[in-house]
Amino acid sequence: MGRIIGIDLGTTNSCVAILDGDTARVIENAEGDRTTPSIIAYTDDGEILVGQPAKRQSITNPKNTLYAIKRLIGRRYEDEEVQRDIKIMPFDIVRADNGDAWVDVKGRKLAAPQISAEVLKKMKKTAEDFLGEPVTEAVITVPAYFNDAQRQATKDAGRIAGLDVKRIINEPTAAAFAYGVNKVQGERKIAVYDLGGGTFDISIIEIDEMDGEKTFEVLSTNGDTHLGGEDFDNRLINYLVDEFKREQGIDLRKDQLALQRLKDSAEKAKIELSSAQQTEVNLPYITADATGPKHMNIKVTRSKLESLVEDLVKKTIEPLKTALKDAGLSVSQLDDIILVGGQTRMPMVQKAVADFFGKEPRKDVNPDEAVAMGAAIQGAVLAGEKHDVLLLDVTPLSLGIETMGSVMTTLIEKNTTIPTKKSQVFSTADDNQSAVTIHVLQGERKRATDNKSLGQFNLEGIRPAPRGLPQIEVTFDIDADGILHVSAKDKETGKEQNITIQASSGLSDDEIQRMVREAEANAAEDKKFEELVQARNHADALIHATRKQITEAGTALPADEKAKIDAAVKALEDALKSEDKATIEAKQQELMTASQKLMEIAQQQAQQHQHAHQGADAGADTAGGKAHDDVVDAEFEEVKDDKK
């Protein structure tokens, strides 16, 4: 078995790590950074950019630069959260044929897992470059409060990226791994408060140690899969837009270019206000009207930002209360509070957490890297490299089926340790019913329609009988990834129907395979593009060197030879404008052939230059030697100016 890497696929940033010896190690990407912006750009020439290169061009290409795609993964277009995002995102979120929220890029519909796969491919390549070997297996983290559809979609993204996803684990649990494996001894109860770019989770975890083996048992989890740093940014953006409109009378909401510049500046301002009391958003030429260009110059204080996001911070407190109640613990029974996610760097967030728990959160866990490091530890456990760690995670939401009267009947309660299996016997609602529809739901509400529909299937061939007589055994089986498998069996006939819940909004196997093929084709295109760029660079270098040699050769180069070389240079310059590597290389070869006489002259001149230097050096040695002989035994004596 090869190395299993750990990937934190974040809303704002992503990170990849491996276990190096006994310690998890974050791997730097090609740009030298330890985290990679989860930004994907589709350029006019067909190139796909990921990370910083995508972020750098976002201002000039806002409609085709995609970010916070994790907020769409596994979601329906009609979802309330998606409808909110449609109003604020610069790119086009559209309804797919299966009801999913997809993105339209240059007239092409892309699924959220397909887009996220580009980030995963970057993480995969980062690990491969570091390890010097192919990587095919990974542990990928998800928010603890992700539902079944979102977990499935994340696994699909891994498959599209060419990864066998060995395990999906919850982000707070992964962070607890990173903290607990080397930093603590004995039994401890911890709370992991995870406020990232797009999601919020709270998990209460018990770490127990016996005979050198550590057990991480998740006691409860709660959260909000649509609350994070992006929402904080949007509050600040809206404030800046309103202030600018008040001052200048221009509404920037209709200007995508201005909004993209504003998004970058708002994010920077928010980060600066974590360490400073005041900052300035200064954007020259943000827009223009009939009177000329307009500039934005707005001061923002920390207290102003805090007033804008106060309700968002408060929104994280209720899940804390629920998680503690579900775990059967009081605040005083917790030993440590761990902060995860970039948004927890905000002093207001840290104070809210400290006030609620009555103790300061620990500062020795890197909020941006802990999740990937924990995933790497889990990867090492699965690969058999690490044996002294056991993880007992939970399902975040209750699972059940719709029964008579549109009621959700729960089979597996939320916060049940996984993997788990539960069966229950149901019957028919009507006389002589020959088939039943099993409608699988996830959520905490009693009314079936108020919960998340995960999918449905039919069990047919039931022997006609009075209602209530047939016995249909429904079994729910949740695997270690938190993904649900359901079966229904007629106990009389033995007929059985099994499915892995493929949410009605999920990708089919055929669609995933198509996207895998497209990803592979893109990889081939990327390689082709890289080779074209290399050919162009070599050609540019050759043109530069040739022109320099022509200048140095001067009159030694016959006019007809110079004309021949000039023509070859022109032909190569024309070839550089094409997209054809073979043409560039052919014209490059022609220039080298045409420049043979020039190279001979350059060689002769170099030899003459060398001989001249050698002669000068020999003369200097002789003179130097004589001078040296004159002063070997002399005393130091000051030389007067008038004797010079």
Swiss-Prot record:
Xref: PROSITE patterns: HSP70_1 (PS00297), HSP70_2 (PS00329), HSP70_3 (PS01036)
Keyword Lipid metabolism: no
Keywords, ordered alphabetically: ATP-binding, Chaperone, Nucleotide-binding, Phosphoprotein, Stress response
Residues that bear Phosphothreonine: T199
Induction description: By stress conditions e.g. heat shock.
Positions of the UniProt region annotated as Disordered: 601-644
Acidic residues composition bias: residue spans: 632-644
GO molecular function: ATP binding; ATP-dependent protein folding chaperone; unfolded protein binding
InterPro entries found in the cross-reference section: ATPase_NBD, Chaperone_DnaK, Heat_shock_70_CS, HSP70_C_sf, HSP70_peptide-bd_sf, Hsp_70_fam
Biased composition (Low complexity): 602-625
Annotated family: Belongs to the heat shock protein 70 family.
Function statement: Acts as a chaperone.
Protein name, UniProt field: Chaperone protein DnaK
